[in-house]
Amino acid sequence: MYTVKLEIFEGPFDLLFHLIEKNEIDLMDIPISIILDQYMEYIRSLQEMDLDVASEFIVMAATLVEIKSRMLLPKFRLEEEAEKIEEDPREELVKQLIEYKKYKEIAQLLSGICGINRRFFKEEPDLNYIDKRVALNYSVEDIVNVYRKILERNKEKENKIEIKKEEYTVVSKIKELLTYLVKKPALWFSEIVRKSRSKLEVVVSFVALLELIKLNRVAAEQQTAYGDIFIRFLGREGRKHDPGRQD
């Protein structure tokens, strides 16, 4: 008797991305034959273990087979089409994988906020009930008199206190982050939110960070799941977006 441990993937793109990273393959030049063989090996493993194979995995397998077939077909072209740029059968798949990579990185960054919250905000303590009964040897009249005195004392001390609700906006936090980064071009996200007064402020700061990443003003890296986020300033103008680049 032996046990086989099989990794579970959220969907076909999750599996494909795993195979690409495992084989250290360039997204822009995917060897379809190698990836298809490994992909089908995983599908067969599921079937051998009598596990249901989701329809989207089958659809992706068919797509990979089609791409491989198109790449193997003889390239007969008419003379008038000779000057046209030949379309790579992998092009659409590469676009989808690049998009998936973006969402995967954002999801990892979002998961990091949970770990940061746990670091800065304590959970509510467990309150264990302790029964300590005390006998009150007072009459109703005594209690009423004490209550009346408390009311009179409070009237004398009554002062209106206005508590101004702090408002945080993504725009203001973007400006704040840029101010930090101009002074210190490389820092940890925990350094930014260390003095945050509420969870809301931490969340708004994180959304501001995502916006700066989208604008290519900063690069962010997270070494471990739920870990701190390392931020690098790319300058006031940022840099041009390169889908194939991995920071």
UniProtKB/Swiss-Prot annotation:
Q: Which keywords are on file for this protein?
A: Cell cycle, Cell division, Chromosome partition, Cytoplasm
Gene3D superfamilies under this entry?
A: 6.10.250.2410, Structural maintenance of chromosome 1. Chain E (1.10.10.580)
Q: Could you name the Gene Ontology cellular component terms for this entry? A: cytoplasm
Q: What is its main location?
A: cytoplasm
The GO annotation for biological process reads: cell division; chromosome segregation; DNA replication
Q: Return the InterPro entries for the record.
A: ScpA, ScpA-like_C
Write out the annotated subcellular location.
Cytoplasm
Q: According to its UniProt record, which protein family does this protein belong to?
A: Belongs to the ScpA family.
Question: Briefly, what is this protein's role?
Answer: Participates in chromosomal partition during cell division. May act via the formation of a condensin-like complex containing Smc and ScpB that pull DNA away from mid-cell into both cell halves.
UniProt-listed PANTHER family: SEGREGATION AND CONDENSATION PROTEIN A
Q: How does it assemble?
A: Component of a cohesin-like complex composed of ScpA, ScpB and the Smc homodimer, in which ScpA and ScpB bind to the head domain of Smc. The presence of the three proteins is required for the association of the complex with DNA.
Record protein name field: Segregation and condensation protein A
The species this protein was found in? Caldanaerobacter subterraneus subsp. tengcongensis (strain DSM 15242 / JCM 11007 / NBRC 100824 / MB4)
